[in-house]
């Protein structure tokens, strides 16, 4: 696994290569961003978590950081995903109006050579295989 200066990540095994990157933008006039991206790793396993704290500012930042940190730490330490999610769900406040947890997340879990993707209220991930990707041509 290699990290680059642009907050990216490159994972290679058995001839496969996966690249990840992220960019977070603060809302206008906000000092803190409501998105949090955490990477935890050991000798064989890698966990990437993206969390989005609903709303903006300090509250969104704290909740997304708490969510990403809890999930990445528990999963890299072999806690089952459903148990980790329950622990996070018990910790996060719930919006009384929308009845939603105040943070969403996506987890990408590399265990040895197996990769799992878990999503909770985030937009669907878009897997791209460049061997099967047809790019539009300019005409």
Q: Model-derived features: where do they sit?
A:
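Beta-strand-turn-beta hairpins that frame and shape the catalytic cleft
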Residues: 16, 43, 112-114
């Amino acid at each position: 696994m290699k990290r680059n200066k642009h907050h990216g990540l490159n994972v290679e095994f058995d001839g496969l290569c996966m690249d990840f990157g992220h960019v977070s933008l603060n809302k206008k006039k906000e000092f803190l961003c409501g998105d949090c991206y955490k990477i935890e790793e050991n000798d064989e396993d890698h966990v990437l978590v993206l969390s989005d704290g609903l709303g903006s500012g300090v509250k969104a930042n704290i909740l997304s950081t708490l969510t990403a940190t809890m999930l990445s730490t528990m999963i890299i330490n072999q806690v089952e995903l459903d148990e980790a999610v329950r622990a996070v769900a018990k910790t996060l406040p719930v919006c009384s109006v929308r009845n939603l947890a105040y943070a969403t997340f996506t987890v990408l879990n590399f265990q040895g050579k197996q990769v799992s993707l878990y999503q909770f209220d985030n937009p669907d991930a878009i897997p791209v295989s460049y061997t099967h990707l047809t790019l539009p041509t300019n005409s």
